[in-house]
């Protein structure tokens, strides 16, 4: 007598349900929409320094010393714009505020246990230009701290690396201000 046509998934429900692991960025859909609207409306709510930087980075033609045309990739632009929008426009300073404000399903809301310091991240693929986004964020913070005399912005920065390979790459990019001299940042 043949067995029933049960599959492994039927025998162990939930074992192959990967949806909990795919929900690592629950705020992204709402933020992506809001940031696009904010961009289309001319970056309202930012300092004059931030507006100058955004216009320079994304609305100015850049030529490298090699005479090659340079533009930031769309993922890099979206990452720094989102960071600026969340920090400067919406003034979100905790993961709790971020989750409560932008998560679409409040039933899945799990507030972090330790949330005393503002922490921001961008989730970007390998080779998509995370180091360039880091340099954009540093320039944005530094010049707002200096030009706007605003204590909400930093003048000193700590860059952490997950391993020696990444550390060596970051060191070669940032050592001696190389990335700030080679890229059109300011």
Regions from the PLM with identified roles:
Residues 1-186:
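RecA-like P-loop NTPase motor core of helicase/translocase proteins
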């Amino acid at each position: 007598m043949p067995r029933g046509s049960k599959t492994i998934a039927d025998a162990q429900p939930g074992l192959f349900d990967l949806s909990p692991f795919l929900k690592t960025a629950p705020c992204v859909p709402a933020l992506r929409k809001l940031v696009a609207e904010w961009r289309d409306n001319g970056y309202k709510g930012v300092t004059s320094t931030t507006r100058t930087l955004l216009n320079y980075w994304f609305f100015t033609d850049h030529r490298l010393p090699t005479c090659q045309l340079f533009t930031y990739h769309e993922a890099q632009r979206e990452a720094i714009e989102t960071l600026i929008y969340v920090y400067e426009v919406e003034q979100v300073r905790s993961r709790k505020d971020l989750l409560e404000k932008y998560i679409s399903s409040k039933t899945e809301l799990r507030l972090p246990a330790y949330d005393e310091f503002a922490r921001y991240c961008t989730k970007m693929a390998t080779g998509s230009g995370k180091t360039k986004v880091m340099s954009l964020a540093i320039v944005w913070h530094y010049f707002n701290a200096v030009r706007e005399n605003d204590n909400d912005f930093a003048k000193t920065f700590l860059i952490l690396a997950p391993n020696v390979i990444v550390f060596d790459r970051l060191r070669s990019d940032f050592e001696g201000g190389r990335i700030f001299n080679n890229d059109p940042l300011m």
